[in-house]
């Protein structure tokens, strides 16, 4: 009898999440169907590990997929998307190449936490940990992008050349290349590949 109750509850919860989240777009990007479906199912799956109701999560949270396909958009418009989610509990889901950027935004804005989506991690526990408000600065194990590196990343994403960046930042071209190299090491990729 209890397995039927559990099944019924799970079905009801899953149905609730799928119906309700379409209009509110609490998972970004809603156009990434696999991420959207996978994260919706994960949240339902960890229902017993989280303290908040699914309705509250749907209403108050925004889950953002920071993958290589969406990084350029987030880099170019970080002030816009940060303003758009103001007042919400923002959870960044970071792929390996975006971990340092996720850490930057965590330190420099009002982000609730970061879920690192590496293959060896238990994403269910990490997601519950962040939703429950337990993610703290001490939980960040990886490097974060510095303010200067972020400025150079933004300008590179806009198509600016190192010489122009150096003139704007009032530094040498060599310094621009040093900051780019440092950012690339933290992002595990060349900047031009990430921001195309």
From Swiss-Prot:
Induction: Negatively regulated by H-NS. Positively autoregulated. Also positively regulated by IHF. Keywords: Activator, Cytoplasm, DNA-binding, Transcription, Transcription regulation. Its main location: cytoplasm. Residues 138-196 form the HTH luxR-type domain. This is HTH-type transcriptional regulator EcpR. The gene is ecpR. Pfam families: GerE. GO terms for cellular component: cytoplasm.
């Amino acid at each position: 009898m209890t397995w039927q109750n559990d099944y019924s509850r799970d079905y009801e919860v899953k149905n609730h999440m799928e119906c309700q989240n379409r209009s509110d777009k609490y998972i970004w990007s809603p156009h990434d169907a696999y991420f959207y479906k996978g994260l919706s199912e994960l949240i339902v799956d960890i229902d017993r590990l989280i303290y908040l109701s699914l309705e509250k999560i749907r209403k108050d949270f925004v889950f953002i997929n920071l993958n290589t396909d969406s990084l350029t958009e987030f880099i170019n418009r970080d002030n816009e998307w940060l303003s758009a989610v103001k007042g919400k509990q923002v959870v960044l889901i970071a792929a390996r190449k975006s971990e340092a950027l996720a850490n930057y935004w965590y330190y420099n804005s009002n982000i609730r936490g970061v879920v690192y989506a590496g293959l060896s991690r238990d994403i269910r526990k990490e997601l519950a940990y962040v939703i429950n408000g337990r993610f703290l600065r001490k939980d960040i194990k990886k490097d974060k992008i510095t303010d200067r590196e972020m400025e150079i990343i933004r300008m590179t994403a806009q198509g600016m050349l190192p010489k122009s960046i150096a003139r704007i930042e009032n530094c040498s071209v060599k310094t621009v290349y040093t900051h780019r190299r440092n950012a690339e090491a933290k992002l595990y990729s060349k900047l031009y590949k990430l921001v195309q």
